[in-house]
Regions:
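GH16 jelly-roll
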Residues: 1-156
Length: 156
């Protein structure tokens, strides 16, 4: 994927628990394969949200970040997901691993159905730099999205 640039642009490639409407966020679980703030051209984040680690009064989410040339060419964002860990990569370079612990479902809701969301948002209270009014049009370019196995997703 090639990330757009511009103050207030917020592309994300993520996975959300399919029971979101029944149990709500963050109980459903969220895996951000990649998030990017358009005002920070080369900085991307891979983040794990759940009932224990979240921005709703829990412990701040576990996040891995990297400085890559996100806006100037296609990059491959990847999560390897198995029953005990989530490993994050950009262009094959390892970012970090989130491990299942003995804390139960509050720390590991990742043993249920999830669905993929590829989106480009504009503005948010999470934006570190505000939003420009004259940055449009913008686009998030995705060459392909591949599910390698039932719990492994690769987006490029």
């Amino acid at each position: 994927a090639v990330m757009p640039e511009g103050q207030g642009i917020w592309p994300a490639l993520w996975i959300l628990g399919s029971n979101h409407f029944q149990v709500g966020w963050p109980t459903c679980g969220e895996i951000d394969i990649m998030e990017h703030y358009g005002c920070d051209d080369d900085h991307i984040h891979s983040t794990v949200h759940n009932n224990m680690y979240n921005w709703n009064g829990g412990i701040p989410p576990t996040s891995y970040s990297a400085y890559v040339n996100a806006t100037s060419g296609f990059r491959i964002y990847e999560v390897e997901w198995n029953e005990d860990e989530l490993k994050f990569y950009v262009d094959g370079e390892y970012l970090g691993t989130y491990f299942k612990t003995n804390s139960g479902w509050q720390q590991w809701p990742y043993d249920q159905d999830f669905h993929i969301i590829l989106n480009l948002a504009v503005g948010s209270h999470f934006m570190p730099c505000g939003t420009e009014n004259n940055l449009f049009p913008e686009k998030l370019e995705i060459d392909s999205s591949t599910t390698l196995s039932i719990k492994s997703l690769k987006i490029s």
